[in-house]
């Protein structure tokens, strides 16, 4: 990229927005002019970019004039409110919310998985759900090699998935519980300190949550294959940052753990961390602030009578690859 771009970050003061700004700087994205947009209560404050203080502006319908790329992480309602303004201005909206992901004319993109879909955009490109990204960066290369037929996932999702307020609640409740103080859950349905909550997003009539069906529907859309059977259970865990997932995979063809390790070692965006004998395996503490997804505990599924099944454990930074980094990578491909 030789030219420079005017980039807007909408939702600049949120956890993902702040990470977007840092990622633009770390990856030397050719930003000629950076506009930081947020609500009226944040207007006038400043955030640093490349050593300079950038004043945050209130987001209005006129904020996108002259903008080339608008990175949105301000919630689905805000994305819907400003979509027409962004597209009319000639900018490309890269949206981190779930507002447009399943629309037929909106590409849903992970650059390591389906970069070719970017070309189909009509002004809006959707960032997938964080758990879907972390899963598919590891699963897609295996699917390309051996064709995935069935996937069962259990997630261990950090409090960062609920934003800064989620992480703060974990820290506060941990202190309160250690001191024997009463707690009052606010960011989550139940206490998150020293607890697990098998409830992310709202429940549907079939007993699944919206989060679980996002992983199903988004996977099928990005792999362009509605025949893949998928079931997920999403669980919030008392971890500050970085999600983990236990994946049981069934393929059309036989695959060994050795083959899987070789495929993943050669795949972009994946680091194989798989030496259990020496206590080496993916953990959220090691995935935090890392660009790559960590993949390990790769083993044959012994519940099967053939070699078409694998079990894999992955960890990835939800705020980075699960959100901000993926959005910036999409911008790099435009």
Task: Give residue spans per PLM region.
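N-terminal Rossmann-like NAD(P) cofactor-binding subdomain of oxidoreductases
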Residues: 1-192, 227-229, 262, 279, ...
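A glycine-rich, Thr/Ser-enriched phosphate-binding loop motif common to dinucleotide/cofactor-binding enzymes
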Residues: 123-134, 207-216, 322-326
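Active-site-proximal catalytic alpha-helix in oxidoreductases
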Residues: 169, 190-198, 239-244, 249
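Oxyanion-binding "anion nests"
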Residues: 193-240
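Generic solvent-exposed, charged/amphipathic alpha-helical segments
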Residues: 21, 216-220, 261, 265
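C-terminal active-site/capping subdomain that shapes the small-molecule cofactor and substrate pocket
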Residues: 228-334
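Glycine-rich beta-alpha junction loops
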Residues: 40-42, 130-131, 155-162, 196-204, ...
